[in-house]
Amino acid sequence: MCVYYEHKIYDDRLSFLKRLRLRKPISWFYAVKIFIDNYRLAQKANSDTVLVYDMVDIHHLRYHRAIQLEPKRFSNKKNFYKFLYLEKKASQKADLVVTVSEDEEKYMQKFANENKLLTISNIHYPKKTIEEVPSFYERENILFVGSIHPPNIDAVEFLINEIMPIVWAKNNSIGVNIVGNVNEVMKEIVHPNVKFLGYVPDMEEFLLKSKIMVAPLRYGAGVKGKIGQAFEYFLPVVTTPIGAEGMKLENHKNAIIAENKEDFAEAILNLYSNEDLWKTLQNNSEDSLFPLSKENLENKIDLIEKNLL
């Protein structure tokens, strides 16, 4: 592996790649724009290079779902068609297309031969043992984690404006801690039970002290890192079908999956007071991480090396 820093006065990427004189290198591109901007350069430098397009998530699918929520927003339609074109082109040009979940691998069979599709998901593993984490009665409040990303902004608005009023009508003691720089664009939300904590370098304290992780995502794509992070610390999760996709979660076994605001609010209230259900979800947290394990990743990398080199 090598790292290249481009200083155009002295060098450029093409000259650098040619000087390496690599034999059948793997050129791995992260996200569609990087692939489209650079795959020809990789081929020019090494005619036998193997092109890997790592999708991260399916951008056009995310915008398609956003259109369903906001059909009049022109930017969603514009981005949908833009990324549909780019992702179709990249999947056709690449020798291997890496998706983040088996759901997205199946979806991408519309655009690429299934023989060149492979799922490599996020990597998560337990950071504590179940014996090391606080018990049901040692925890309080619910946790949301999100950066400045449109699906996260929508999720926070949905949570605070539509879900939590139903919750607070029955239990107004439940607080909501929101971690991540989503706070920078949501200053209009002010509520005594809601704390916007901004970027937190080490989230372990919140993952250990919170009673529930919530992920009320109404659109998006890919595998949601916030849910994997909760499982790392045996923190039970309430989410939506969009939040759960790609992780092979079973409702009321690995997580509670709610379709609408009423069901989501009821799930929070039930899980917040039901120790038996809470422990059931907690006990299944580690099994939920198996598709996201380091061992699974190593097997997939071995598969790439055997099939492409």
Where are the model-predicted features located?
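Conserved catalytic-core segment of nucleotide-activated headgroup transferases in glycan assembly
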Residues: 72, 92, 96-98, 102, ...
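Acidic donor-binding loop of glycosyltransferase active sites
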Residues: 95, 208-222, 233-235
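C-terminal alpha-helical cap of glycosyltransferases
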Residues: 294-309
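A short, well-ordered alpha-helix in the C-terminal region of glycosyltransferases
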Residues: 277-291, 303
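Acceptor-binding helix/loop patch of EC 2.4 sugar-transfer enzymes
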Residues: 20, 46-82, 106, 137-138
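Short acidic/histidine- and often glycine-rich active-site loop of Leloir-type glycosyltransferases
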Residues: 241-252, 256-257
